[in-house]
Design a protein with these regions (language model features):
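Structural alpha/beta core scaffold segments of enzyme domains
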Residues: 1-166
Length: 166
């Protein structure tokens, strides 16, 4: 299985399908004055932020840690690092310098690097900075995956959608 179409034909899905129903969409669409159907495809996408993923953790007094992270979500970085280190949230201080061009790729992708630098800093009891090259960054971080869906919609003369099936 190489393509999404192959997976659909063979009913081989990564996750279990979810079905949300309200009413009898096929009947309503068939009885609608107007009908459209089609297929929507969207290609996959890698986040290509301008600055690669970087995290630096500095041990502080009283088993606290200062983390500099190129993240768009410092509060969640704090929570994840605290959980990984088995510490209270208030023992982790996350600072973010100016970052530009994150395009959403630094919202959740940066946690991994902050956690690794924090584990190493705690173990070594010294500052640890983690900056990986672009190739490894692209391999390690998530993507927006390609998707395809077929749709049918029934609507009235004035454009009111009566029912849809996706």
């Amino acid at each position: 299985i190489i393509t999404i179409e192959d997976a659909i034909k063979k009913k081989s899905f990564v996750l279990k399908s979810k079905t949300i129903r309200r009413g009898k969409s096929s009947t309503v669409i068939a009885n609608s004055k107007h009908r459209l159907s089609g297929k929507l495809e969207c290609g996959g996408q890698d986040h290509f932020y301008l600055e690669g993923q970087i995290a630096m953790t500095i041990p502080q007094e009283d088993n606290n840690f200062l983390i500099y992270s190129s993240t768009q979500h410092p509060s969640e970085t704090q929570q994840i690092v605290a959980k990984v280190l088995n510490q209270k949230f208030n023992s982790i201080n996350v600072k973010v310098r100016r970052i530009g061009g994150g395009f959403g790729g630094k919202e959740t992708q940066s946690f991994f690097f902050a956690a690794i630098s924090s584990i190493a800093a705690k173990k070594l009891n010294r500052p640890v900075k983690l900056r990986i090259d672009r190739e490894d960054d692209m391999i390690m971080t998530g993507k927006r995956h390609q998707f395809i869906f077929n749709y049918e919609v029934g609507f009235s003369d004035n454009g009111k959608i009566m029912s849809s099936k996706i």
